[in-house]
Regions:
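Terminal amphipathic alpha-helical/low-complexity segments used for targeting or macromolecular assembly
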Residues: 1-14
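Structural signal for interior beta-strand "rungs" in well-ordered beta-sheet cores
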Residues: 11-99
Length: 99
């Protein structure tokens, strides 16, 4: 999402929870009831969809889509441009590759 000045906007729905220790880069969209927990990093251009949960210490690399209701358990790194499908659960310390 870009503003009139061409800069990337970050959008967080009011019903989403983003921990104060999380880092959200520009161009990220966090949809209703999504949760981004402690010490998570979400890089540029990601979508954290409805009800998705990204747990403590995760890194979501650039351009990822964490789909509806997906859960990324703690300490995972999701590779750039990956899509975590609706309802999918990414287990502890699993490195996820693009798909």
């Amino acid at each position: 999402i870009t503003g009139a000045d061409g800069r990337l906007a970050t959008v967080v729905h009011p019903t989403a929870y983003v921990s104060p220790t999380a880092s959200i880069e520009k161009g990220v969209v966090v949809l209703p009831k999504a949760v981004i927990n402690t010490d998570v990093t979400v890089k540029r251009g990601c979508i954290i969809n409805l009800g998705a949960i990204v747990d403590h210490g995760c890194v979501i690399e650039q351009g990822c889509h964490i789909c509806l209701g997906a859960i990324v358990k703690g300490e995972n790194r999701i590779a750039a441009l990956s899509k975590i499908e609706a309802g999918e659960v990414v287990q502890l310390r699993q490195c996820h590759v693009n798909k």
